[in-house]
Amino acid sequence: AVETGCNVVIEKPMALTLADAEKVVYASLKYRKQVFCVMQNRYSPPSVWIKEMVDSGRLGKIYMVQLNGYWNRDERYYKPGGWHGDAVLDGGTLFTQFSHFIDIMYWLFGDICNIQARFADFNHAGLTAFEDSGFVNFNFVNGGMGSLSYSTSILNRKMESSVLIVPDGGRVKL
């Protein structure tokens, strides 16, 4: 759409591959149009507050960040024939379910490195083409370490969505 002179709003995920994401960015630059990915959690009052706290330095040095997302996604969500659960169309649990957590973390603390991960498919074999649970550990390029723990195998309902920040000036859990 940028080729036709339009600014574009893209629902998450922006792309499922680095190559596709780069195409979007390059088209935006080439045609001088804005492209926005829907990441509305940046505008929630708690997110705005914690961004102000981090940027102002009031929390001090960030030692650790822990993201937790434990949700229920069962056969009602992953209906056969739909895009949910299809690796090519859906991208996987981190793209569709937890990309907002990853965006908030990146927005607050910057890029990551030294990534190590473990994944499992506990409850969705036959329903999805990807894992439903995982642990991801990493370091922040600017210092500190972090982790993401997630699952869509929680029985009946969403259990937890949280961000724990451990700085030298206290602690914050959202």
What label would you give each PLM region?
Residues 1-3, 23-25, 50-53, 78-82, ...:
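Short, glycine/charged-enriched secondary-structure capping and boundary segments
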Residues 1-42, 57:
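Beta-strand-loop-alpha-helix segment that lines the small-molecule cofactor/substrate pocket
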Residues 16, 73, 162:
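Short beta->alpha connector loops of Rossmann-like oxidoreductase domains
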Residues 18, 25, 51, 103-106, ...:
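A cross-family signal for key residues in well-ordered alpha-helices
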Residues 19, 45, 157:
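Residues that form or flank phosphate/diphosphate-binding pockets in enzymes
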Residues 41-127:
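Predominantly a Rossmann-like dinucleotide-binding segment in NAD(P)-dependent oxidoreductases
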Residues 96, 102-174:
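Contiguous beta-strand/loop segments that form the cofactor/metal-binding neighborhood of enzyme cores
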